[in-house]
Each structure stands twice: as C-alpha cells, then as structure tokens.
C-alpha cells in the first residue's frame, strides 16, 4: 500500500511505500511552463521555458543516493531516461514544446536495487494551438493574453465553424461570448468540443465572437489556485 504525502504543492512531495516504510521519494512535484508566445501552428511550434523535474530518495529525512531514474509521461506512456547528479535524477527540459505539459511519474532505483516512484506535474496556462496555418495577431502586453483572428465572411444560409483550439494543463474550460455577452444555446448555433458552429447564416449571426479559455493552478508554496485565461476574438460578417 502506498500513500502520497505532499508537504508543499510547489516544492516537495513524498511518496510513502509501506512495504519499505523508511524510504520516501522527494521531488519538486510541480513546475510551471512559461510560453514564449500564445499561438502555435503545424509550421510554428509554440515553445515554453520549463524548469527541470527532479526526484530523489531519503530515509527518515536523510538523503539516499539513487543510481538510475526515469520519467514517464502519463498521457502517452513515453519514457524519458533521467540524468543522475549528486544522487538525484533530473529530467532536463528547458525550452520545449508546450505539449510536454502534463502529469509524469518518476521512478528511481536506489543502490540497494529497490525501485521507488512518485508523481509530478508540469502546469501550462492556456495557449492557442491551431491545426492549420492561420492569420492572427497577438495584442502586445495584454493581460489576459489576447489574440485577434482575421475577419470571417460567409454567405446567407452557409454553415461556419469558429475554432477555439485552446491547449493548457490542467485541462482548460472554454466559453463563448458574442458582442461582450455570454452566448447561450439556440437553434442557430451548436458546439463541437471547444468549437462554435453557426448554422444557416443570417444577419443575426453578425458580430464579434470571443472564446475564453481558462484554467487554474498554484504558483507558489501553499498558495491558492490562480486563474489563467486567454481571449481569442473573431469578427463575423454575413454577405
């Protein structure tokens, strides 16, 4: 039986293994990615600066050297061999795609050949990761981050899809507004995941649409969950 004991949400977590109760795994538990911008496409990888993850072991508060360690990304099972330095194991990240954000499991092997594990997470505030090339612009120094898309034009009776490809960790919530007001349900609109579909375009669809993506996570030791948002605006015209 195992129990995770998190001493602080941002700096230290221990995982107690009752089969060898003296051994605990320590780690930096959680790090926050800092995106270099807020828009990515297949031709423009969106990078973030991310601190290295690390894990170690201790016995009744005293450091125990580890001889090997690896990190598994839980979203896809991909395994990364860690670098051992001064008895701890590190996953060197630095500048990386925002898509590396998520939950990880660290497994360390101590000198007595025993394996111990703990969980870590890379947080990421909301960004936009488009599936194809787009014409958008970021509002300089906007808080929350604010992205403006190209004007969209459609013919009467056509169907139009407004994308909101928000990427974040934890998983973001997405909501839509039109002309600054929350967009409710009606026969003329529907939702496909985070995307908004305008059915049978009429003059009633004309306006400024905004998708808002938000998530929250703590930024410092024992701190509260801080909300993070991104705005994406699109002007719609009907011809």
From Swiss-Prot:
Residue ranges occupied by any Ig-like C2-type domain in the UniProt entry: 145-211
Pfam family, one: Ig_3
UniProt main location, coarse: secreted
Subcellular location as annotated: Secreted
UniProt-listed SMART domains: IGc2 (SM00408)
Disulfide bonds: 164-211
Entry keywords, A to Z: Disulfide bond, Glycoprotein, Immunoglobulin domain, Secreted, Signal
SUPFAM superfamilies: Immunoglobulin (SSF48726)
InterPro entries documented for this protein: Ig-like_dom, Ig-like_dom_sf, Ig-like_fold, Ig_sub2, IgSF_CEA-related
Tissues of expression: Expressed in body wall muscles.
Sugar attachment sites: 43
Highest rank taxon of the organism: Eukaryota
Signal sequence annotation: 1-21
GO cellular component: extracellular region
Listed PROSITE patterns: IG_LIKE
PANTHER family referenced in this protein's UniProt entry, alphabetically: CARCINOEMBRYONIC ANTIGEN-RELATED CELL ADHESION MOLECULE 5-RELATED, CARCINOEMBRYONIC ANTIGEN-RELATED CELL ADHESION MOLECULE 8
Protein task: Probably not involved in maintaining the position of ASI and ASH head neuron cell bodies and ventral nerve cord axons of PVQ, PVP, RMEV, AVK and HSN neurons.
Protein name: Zwei Ig domain protein zig-7
Taxonomy of the source species: Eukaryota, Metazoa, Ecdysozoa, Nematoda, Chromadorea
Gene responsible for this protein: zig-7
């Amino acid at each position: 039986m195992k129990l995770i004991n998190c001493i602080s949400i941002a700096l230290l977590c221990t995982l107690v293994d009752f089969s060898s109760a003296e051994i605990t795994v320590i780690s930096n538990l959680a790090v926050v990615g800092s995106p270099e911008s807020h828009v990515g496409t297949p031709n423009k990888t969106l990078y973030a600066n991310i601190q290295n993850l690390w894990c170690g072991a201790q016995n009744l508060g005293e450091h125990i050297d580890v001889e090997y360690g690896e990190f598994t990304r839980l979203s896809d099972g991909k395994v990364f061999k860690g670098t051992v330095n001064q008895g701890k194991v590190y996953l060197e990240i630095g500048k990386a795609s925002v898509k590396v954000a998520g939950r990880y499991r660290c497994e360390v092997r101590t000198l007595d050949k025993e394996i111990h594990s703990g969980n870590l997470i890379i947080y990421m505030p909301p960004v936009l990761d488009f599936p194809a090339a787009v014409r958008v612009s970021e509002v300089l120094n906007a808080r929350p981050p604010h992205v403006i898309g190209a004007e969209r034009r459609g013919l009467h009776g056509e169907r139009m899809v407004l994308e909101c490809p928000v990427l974040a960790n934890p998983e973001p919530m997405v909501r839509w507004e039109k002309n600054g007001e929350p967009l409710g349900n009606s026969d003329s609109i529907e939702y496909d995941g985070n995307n908004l579909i305008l059915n049978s375009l009429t003059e009633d669809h004309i306006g400024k649409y905004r998708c808002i993506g938000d998530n929250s996570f703590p930024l410092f030791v024992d701190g509260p969950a801080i909300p993070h948002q991104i705005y994406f605006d699109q002007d719609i015209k009907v011809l």
